[in-house]
């Protein structure tokens, strides 16, 4: 298992076309936003 640490407003890139953005961290809750092409199933 790969564990990554990121702060709010940082992002993780998966390949060239998928971005995972850390929107907010509130205690143990993390809000993420995923930006990917339509043909990629999330």
Describe each region flagged by the PLM.
Residues 1-42:
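Compact, glycine-rich, soluble single-domain proteins
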């Amino acid at each position: 298992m790969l564990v990554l640490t990121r702060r709010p407003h940082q992002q993780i890139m998966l390949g060239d076309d998928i971005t995972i953005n850390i929107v907010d961290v509130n205690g143990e809750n993390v809000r993420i936003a995923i930006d990917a092409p339509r043909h990629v199933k999330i």
